[in-house]
């Protein structure tokens, strides 16, 4: 089998995994039907995991296959996590905010919402660190959003190592693809490497 055939096979398997996740989520979250139909899927060598620009879910095939094999709930959560990023316009709303803190705030907001659902296909035991952060967020924010979390974290004067520790806890997807929105006018810039339809 040549390299082209291998890539096509990996692409087929990756697409099947993401479609399976989408179908499973849809069964229990029909209220998100429109959002579930919004993504296309593409292999990417720009990430070692998964990520979205709002149009595509990009994935490293070996990473996705291994995650699916060992922890389907993680794949479901990652899919939902990226949907929430897009629904709440996280990729395009940074607007001068400090990137690392904005990325963390978006991840906390998305995970906070996911952890509020009782659906077994996404439920996971929470770590002590996650519970600690949620306690701080819930005690200080009435309606959790990335913007509110960002204001809270900014006001806390966190050291870089604290931000890194929280980021390690809440990071699910790669935000590298959000760079299509990083320009002065905030116009959507389609990436040069956009896969064909």
Give residue spans per PLM region:
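Short, functionally important secondary-structure microenvironments
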Residues: 1-76, 83-197
């Amino acid at each position: 089998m040549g390299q082209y055939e291998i890539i096509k096979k990996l692409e087929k398997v990756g697409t099947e995994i993401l479609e399976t996740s989408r179908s499973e989520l849809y069964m229990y979250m029909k209220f998100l039907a429109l959002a579930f139909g919004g993504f296309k899927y593409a292999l990417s060598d720009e990430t070692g995991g998964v990520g979205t620009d709002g149009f595509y879910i990009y994935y490293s095939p070996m990473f996705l296959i291994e995650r699916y094999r060992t922890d389907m709930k993680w794949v479901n959560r990652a899919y939902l996590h990226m949907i929430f990023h897009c629904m709440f316009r996280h990729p395009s709303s940074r607007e001068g905010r400090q990137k690392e803190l904005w990325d963390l705030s978006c991840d906390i907001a998305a995970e906070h919402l996911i952890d509020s659902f009782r659906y077994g296909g996404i439920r996971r035991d929470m770590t002590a660190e996650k519970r600690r952060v949620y306690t701080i967020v819930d005690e200080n924010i009435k309606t959790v959003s990335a913007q509110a979390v960002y204001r809270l974290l900014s006001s806390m004067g966190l050291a870089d190592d604290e931000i890194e520790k929280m980021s390690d806890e809440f990071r699910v997807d790669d935000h590298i693809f959000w760079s299509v929105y990083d320009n002065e006018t905030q116009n959507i810039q389609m990436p040069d490497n956009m896969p064909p339809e």
